[in-house]
Amino acid sequence: MVAPRISPKIVLVGFALFAIISASLAFPSGLNCPDPKPYPKFFLDSLWSGPSGYLGTTLIQGYVMIDTTGEFDFAKVASINGTFLQYYSKVLGTYVSEMYINLFGQQVKVMEAPFTLLERNPFNRFGEYCMVSNPRSVMPGYVEGLPITNKFFYNTYYNDTHGKSFGNVEQSEYFFFDETRNNSINCLTEFNPDATIKTFTCYKFQKVSNNVIPPTSKRSIEDMDSLRIGGLDLPEELVAPKYRHYFK
């Protein structure tokens, strides 16, 4: 008996619904991410068993898709290749993530963000964290994450830190590892206010080293024309010209 074929559209809809459910389960703690307090690495490794899977150097390959009709008709508008670095900062006493995109032979730094462990209160669970990018304009709003297992965690993005009901959820993403924890995926859903999907961005990750391998040639996203895509400012050249107006 031949198994029924599952439509790619159904799979994407399922991912999107999961992202919405995940976002609704997060309870932000004031929507202001404080500066990180220092903790020993072994403590954070145990507490953040999911995010710890990215400590070191990981290659990324991603695709940005947009819903052009509101009926889950996704068009692939950009391909992304780059490097994701994560390390324990002895100065800050916490994890720091950096993301670089390959562009014309150079690594463009699009994100740097330390983790802040949130103190327990009625609105969060032990182990929740928030992140603030440097510079703040790269990833504005409020970002909060929750580890679930050593192979799964998710982040929720709030675009308004002063709105009703603790702000407005703008997007949600999840991370999932295989058994080796060397391969993983990350899918981020960006929502429109009318409950449709603006963008759907998925990355494949492959860890190449448990140590950080810094780029030999790099630029900053602040030095070039960029578009706001999936919660980050990315180089405009990544997006096909006929689709750029969707992000302006």
Swiss-Prot record:
Residues in the signal sequence: 1-26
Database matches in InterPro entries: DUF5881 (IPR045327)
Cross-referenced Pfam families: DUF5881
Keywords: Signal
Name of the molecule in the record: Uncharacterized protein L737
Species in which this protein is naturally found: Acanthamoeba polyphaga mimivirus (APMV)
Lineage of the organism: Viruses, Varidnaviria, Bamfordvirae, Nucleocytoviricota, Megaviricetes
